[in-house]
Amino acid sequence: MSELRDLVIDAHGGIARWNKVKTVDGDMSITGGLWARKGWPDALKDVHVTAAAEKQWISYRPFIGEGMRTSCTPDHTIIETLDGKPVKDRRNPRAAFDGHTVETPWDDLHLAYFSGYAMWNYLNTPFIFALPGFQTEEIEPWDENGEKRRRLKVAFPDHIATHCPEQIFHVNDEGLICRVDYSAPVAGGAPTAHYLDDHKDFSGIKMATRRRALRRKADGTAIPDPVFVAIDIAEIRFS
């Protein structure tokens, strides 16, 4: 636990407000070089996402084609019709990435799993930091183009599907997360600097509406091109 963790949660709306949330719905466009490399260019360019706040579950629709959606938990990835009829599924989905490299193409269930766990994390952060099993620690600050930013190191519990067990969250002067450093082994494991901006208030909760994932150099600085993942969120609704 850390003072910075509490500051970040409060800046994004506070735990009392978040505890009233059951689901998060978002309309968004997800593009970038990663998807083409994996064989799915523009597959997530115009999607609606529904994520649970009380458990790790998420659904994309449409998925791949009209009339299809996903239903994903850490242990089970399902592609189904809009009325809930399973079309195909994979249990223990993370194991299906064993032996992959950056260039290994994905099938549709790989795509569903990666995009699912990643977006669930994005939509539930930073509030998940208050859950049992998460460990947080403030570490030395970072200078980003002359701006000094505080940093929060977060260790994730084993039962949460995420990019990697330990991630570094950069915090701006408003207490908002503006960058995350991680690597994602299921997507090749390249060191990543994931930038967040254009934070907006949606019913009392602040979320970044623009995200860009870039390659991170050994000195911690980001390589601006190419953009591996670009996420632009048009609307967020809580229920």
Labelled PLM ranges:
Residues 2-5, 226:
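Catalytic cores of transferase enzymes with a strong primary signal for eukaryotic protein kinases
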Residues 3, 83-160:
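Flexible, processing/modification-adjacent segments and terminal tails
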Residues 4, 8-18:
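Alpha-helix capping/hinge segments and adjacent helical runs
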Residues 15-89, 138:
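N-terminal mature ectodomain segment of secretory-pathway/periplasmic proteins
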Residues 18, 35-37, 122, 182, ...:
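Tryptophan-centered motif/residue detector
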Residues 34-43, 57-64, 120-135, 156-162, ...:
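Short, solvent-exposed secondary-structure boundary motifs
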Residues 64-107, 216, 221-238:
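Catalytic loop of the DD-peptidase/beta-lactamase superfamily, centered on the K-T-G motif
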Residues 146-239:
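Gly/Pro-enriched, hydrophobic low-complexity segments
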